[in-house]
Each structure stands twice: as structure tokens, then as C-alpha cells.
């Protein structure tokens, strides 16, 4: 169990390191450099994988061999790309196999060849078994496939590394920064802030440059991070709402890009907000009118980005409605107080009381408008011939008009900042759409390659079937020839037996002749002298004298027994 846990930990750590690289630097977010903490973690996991359960092999009078020697041997046998090997060997400052292996890993990462090189090295399973023990993940087909899939995912990430590192024999290059933070490390943790240090807000967020806010403002800004999206600005004063609104929208846009919410959480696009009166918040209608066609014009491939833009618009609308309601309530209270003061000033004049009643009725109908005409000016426009005798009333009217103009200017600034945020969201949507089109092109190319591979497979399958049929025909023909050869062998065996039997008969006859006395004639038993002629019989080989060979029925050189036997056969 412990060994299995160690193997799983090696592969799990490698997948986690690859996931961290993809999360921090994938999708064109920037290249991986030597200062990246994720690179240090990935290189360590790769080295641990290549050294896990490696068999000890030593060269003659040399140092212990490491995974660098395994990579060199495997690539040389597979006749793969030897460019990384030549590059590492050209580095004279690297003396140990460990440093050369690290340089090989960094070069393959920078060139996008790590997964391909490792796959070539693992094709020869016998060589892999010679270098690694049975517990190595490189010998398990399932884990090997998982590792290669993870490494192939790194081909889409750019690595800008310094390949001329002379100190790889000692350790990997150190790092100093990280782009992705673990959720377990940052969950429930907030950055510490000095109570005496004021917070600075740049001019791009709707306020003047380097404006210092007091501690109460800082605490309110911190509380906004934990408040719901529709109530984040409700607890701030009006001036701080105007400052923090663009900054809040930008933060919400970033959070919406980081977290993919389902479509059911957003309000449907295309619905216009119907207010109670026509002149209430007209700038919201302009904002929605400008944003709706831009988001609807995106292609089908950017549907996810459109949902983000739609959700951000809905959140902006909710925040603006809350802010608008607060401004309307505050404006209504202020105007009621001012109007009561004006009425007290105009109490001696009955004409002023009538004008106050008329203007008060108009105030009730148009008090909810933010960008409408000032209610005091509307009251005085009904009667051109009416004049205000008290100069203090004119001063109050002028102050109210100036306040309305200032509110209108601040709202226009907010509209500009909102349009800027919407423009950024549209640019992001366009970039996402372009990236999606590129991915669709790559997918189409891969599909075409797959179709070609399938056609080649069909052709090879047909050729294989044809070869199998030819092999079957040849097998049948060879069986027939083998049967004929077997018959021939049987015939040859029978002939050999016949020849052996004939040889035995001849040998027995020869033995019979040798047993006879060679000093007398076979026919007349005449003893041969030193000068007697001897004639062998042509049938049995016996010796005959001259008289027997010439006189016996004129048969030359044939003994009487053989001559009688021949006559018997003829008759």
C-alpha cells in the first residue's frame, strides 16, 4: 500500500504542477520564465518521475548513470530528434549526468518537445525495463498515457527560459514569483493593512490622482468585498459611491472573467428597464442601448463571453438603481426642506403662496427625476409675469440649479466610466471569439487528419486481407507438395528395402561359393594343377575346367547345374 501511495503521489504531483502552469500561463496569459514558482515545481516533479525506482547502473571507471543516460540511449535507438542531446553536450560547463538531464528538460520545455521526446524514449519497453524497476510509473501503460497527456497539454504554453545555465549540476534555478495562488492558502485570509497608512485611489477609478481617504473609508472599501453585488455601494455616502463605482465595476468584470457562472443566474438580455416616469435615469437606457447591439453582434463561438457581458450589465444596472434610489431619496428630502424654507419666506405674499402651491405640485410629479429640469425653474416658468420680491429666494433657486448641474456632471462622468468598462468587456469578448475561431480551425485540421488516418487504415486493412488470402493459397499449395513428397519418401523406402533384400541374397550366394573348394572343377571335380586353365561360370561363378566349359552342349563357360536350371526355366 505504501509503494502504491508513493506512485500515485508522483503522478498526482505532476498533474498538479501541469494544472498550475496551465492556470497561470495558459490561453496566451504570458510566457513562463525562470522566475516562475510553477516552473520550479514542474521541473522537480519531472525529475522525481524520471528517477523513481531507477536501477543502479555504473559505467566502467565512471560515475553513476542517471536518467540523462537513459534518454540518450533511448533516443539514439529510436533514431528520434537528437537536437536536445547535441545542445546539452555542447554545454561544457555541465559535468554531471544530473545537470545534463536538467538541461535536457529545460531545452525540451522551451522548444515544446518534452512530451514527444519522452514518448519516443518509452516506445522500447525492454530498454525501459533495463533502466527502471517494476514500481516505476513509466512501465504502467495507464499511468504512462496519463503522464504523456499531461505533458502534451504544455505544448500550448510558451516557455522563455535561459538555456545557458551553468549551475544545473548543483540545483534548479531559483524562483521569485507566482501567478496562481492555491485556494487552500488564500481561503479566508485577507492582506494586512496598516491602520495609519491611508489608502490611495488612482485617477483612473473616478477620483483625483493620489487622493487619500481616511480609515473609515478604508474599512468601508474592505466591507464592499464581502457584500452582495447589489448592495456593495449602499452603505457609502454619495460622493464615495461616485468614486468607487467604476472601481467596483472593474472588479466585478475581473471576477466574472475568472468565475464562469451558469446562464440561469443572469437576467435575460434584451429586456429594457421600465421606470415609473419617462425622465427617470435616461442615461441607463442609453447605456443599455449601446451595450445591447455590441453584445448581440458576437458570433456563436463567443456565447460564454456574451453571458459574462450580460451578467456584468445586469449587475451594473442593479448597482446604479440602488445608487439612484438613494440619490433620489436624498434629493427629495433636501428639496422638501428647501421648499419649506421658501414657503416660509413667501408667506406674506399671497401670489407667492399660489406660485409655491403650483411649483409644489410639479415637484411631486417630477421629483424622482435626476437629469430633468430643476423644479424651481419649472415653477417660475408657468407664470412669466410673476416676480419674486424677495432676493433670498433667487439665491436659493440658483444654489439648487448649481447642485443639479453638479449632479448631472458627476452622472456623466459615471456614464463615461461605465462605457469604458463596457468597451473593455467588448474587446475581451472579441479576443475570446478570435481565440475560439483559431481553436475551431485547429479542430478542423485535426478532423481532416483523422479522416486521412481512417482512410489509410481502411487501405491497410484491405491489403492485410489480401495478404492473408495469398498466404492461405500458398499454404494449401505447400500442403499438396508436402503430400507428394511424403509419397515419394514412402516409395524410396520400399525401394531401399528391396535393394537390401537383393544385397542379402547376393551375399548368401557369395558365401556359398567361397565355401566350395577352389582347387577342383565344379562339373567334373578335376583337380587343377599349376598350369590348368580355370573358367568361372557366368551364372554361379564356380570354376570349370577347359573341357567342361567347352564340351557341355556347346555352352561357353557355364557349369552343367546352371545350364540345367536355365533350360528348366525356358521350358
Swiss-Prot record:
It comes from the Eukaryota. Keywords: Autophagy, Coiled coil, Cytoplasmic vesicle, Lysosome, Metal-binding, Zinc, Zinc-finger. Pfam families: RUFY4 (PF25366), RUN (PF02759). Gene3D superfamilies: 1.20.58.900, Zinc/RING finger domain, C3HC4 (zinc finger) (3.30.40.10). SUPFAM superfamilies: FYVE/PHD zinc finger (SSF57903), RUN domain-like (SSF140741). Residues 174-207 are annotated as: Disordered. The RUN domain and the FYVE-type zinc finger are essential for its function in the positive regulation of macroautophagy. This is RUN and FYVE domain-containing protein 4. It comes from Homo sapiens (Human). The gene is RUFY4.
Amino acid at each position: 500500500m505504501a509503494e502504491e501511495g508513493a506512485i500515485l503521489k508522483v503522478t498526482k504531483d505532476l498533474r498538479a504542477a501541469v494544472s498550475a502552469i496551465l492556470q497561470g500561463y495558459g490561453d496566451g496569459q504570458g510566457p513562463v520564465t525562470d522566475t516562475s514558482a510553477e516552473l520550479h515545481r514542474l521541473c522537480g516533479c519531472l525529475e522525481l518521475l524520471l528517477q523513481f525506482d531507477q536501477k543502479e547502473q555504473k559505467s566502467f571507471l565512471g560515475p553513476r548513470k542517471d536518467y540523462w543516460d537513459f534518454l540518450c540511449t533511448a533516443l539514439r535507438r529510436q533514431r528520434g530528434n537528437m537536437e536536445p542531446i547535441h545542445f546539452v553536450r555542447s554545454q561544457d560547463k555541465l559535468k554531471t549526468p544530473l545537470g545534463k538531464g536538467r538541461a535536457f528538460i529545460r531545452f525540451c520545455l522551451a522548444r515544446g518537445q518534452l512530451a514527444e521526446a519522452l514518448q519516443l524514449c518509452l516506445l522500447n519497453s525492454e530498454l525501459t525495463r533495463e533502466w527502471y524497476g517494476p514500481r516505476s510509473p513509466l512501465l504502467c501503460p495507464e499511468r504512462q498515457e496519463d503522464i504523456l497527456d499531461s505533458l502534451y497539454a504544455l505544448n500550448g504554453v510558451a516557455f522563455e527560459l535561459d538555456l545557458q545555465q551553468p549551475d544545473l549540476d548543483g540545483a534548479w534555478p531559483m524562483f521569485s514569483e507566482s501567478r496562481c495562488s492555491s485556494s487552500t492558502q488564500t481561503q479566508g485570509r485577507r492582506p494586512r493593512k496598516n491602520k495609519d497608512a491611508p489608502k490611495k485611489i488612482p485617477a483612473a477609478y473616478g477620483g483625483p490622482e493620489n487622493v487619500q481617504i481616511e480609515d473609515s473609508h478604508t474599512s468601508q472599501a474592505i466591507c464592499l468585498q464581502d457584500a452582495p453585488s447589489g448592495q456593495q455601494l449602499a452603505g457609502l455616502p454619495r460622493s464615495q459611491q461616485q468614486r468607487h463605482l467604476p472601481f467596483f465595476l472593474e472588479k466585478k468584470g475581473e471576477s466574472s472573467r475568472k468565475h464562469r457562472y451558469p446562464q440561469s443566474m443572469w437576467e435575460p438580455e434584451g429586456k429594457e428597464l421600465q421606470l415609473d416616469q419617462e425622465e427617470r435615469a435616461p442615461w441607463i437606457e442609453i447605456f443599455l442601448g449601446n451595450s445591447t447591439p455590441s453584445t448581440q453582434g458576437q458570433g456563436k463561438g463567443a456565447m460564454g463571453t456574451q453571458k459574462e457581458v450580460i451578467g456584468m450589465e445586469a449587475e451594473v444596472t442593479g448597482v446604479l438603481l440602488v445608487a439612484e434610489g438613494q440619490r433620489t431619496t436624498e434629493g427629495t428630502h433636501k428639496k422638501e426642506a428647501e421648499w419649506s424654507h421658501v414657503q416660509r419666506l413667501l408667506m406674506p405674499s399671497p401670489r407667492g403662496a399660489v406660485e409655491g402651491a403650483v411649483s409644489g405640485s410639479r415637484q411631486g410629479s417630477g421629483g424622482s427625476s435626476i437629469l430633468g429640469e430643476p423644479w424651481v425653474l419649472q415653477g417660475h416658468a408657468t407664470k412669466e409675469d410673476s416676480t419674486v420680491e424677495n432676493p433670498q429666494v433667487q439665491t436659493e433657486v440658483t444654489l439648487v440649479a448649481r447642485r443639479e448641474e453638479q449632479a448631472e456632471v458627476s452622472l456623466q462622468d459615471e456614464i463615461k466610466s461605465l462605457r469604458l468598462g463596457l468597451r473593455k468587456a467588448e474587446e475581451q469578448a472579441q479576443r475570446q471569439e478570435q481565440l475560439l475561431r483559431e481553436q475551431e480551425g485547429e479542430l478542423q485540421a485535426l478532423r481532416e487528419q483523422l479522416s486521412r488516418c481512417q482512410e489509410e487504415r481502411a487501405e491497410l486493412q484491405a491489403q492485410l486481407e489480401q495478404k492473408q488470402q495469398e498466404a492461405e493459397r500458398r499454404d494449401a499449395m505447400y500442403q499438396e507438395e508436402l503430400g507428394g513428397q511424403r509419397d515419394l519418401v514412402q516409395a524410396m523406402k520400399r525401394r531401399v528395402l528391396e535393394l537390401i533384400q537383393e544385397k542379402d541374397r547376393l551375399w548368401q550366394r557369395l558365401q556359398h561359393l567361397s565355401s566350395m573348394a577352389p582347387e577342383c572343377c565344379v562339373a567334373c571335380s578335376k583337380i587343377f594343377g599349376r598350369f590348368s586353365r580355370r573358367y568361372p561360370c557366368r551364372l554361379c561363378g564356380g570354376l570349370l575346367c577347359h573341357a567342361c566349359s567347352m564340351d557341355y552342349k556347346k555352352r561357353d563357360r557355364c557349369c552343367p547345374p546352371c545350364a540345367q536350371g536355365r533350360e528348366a526355366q525356358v521350358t
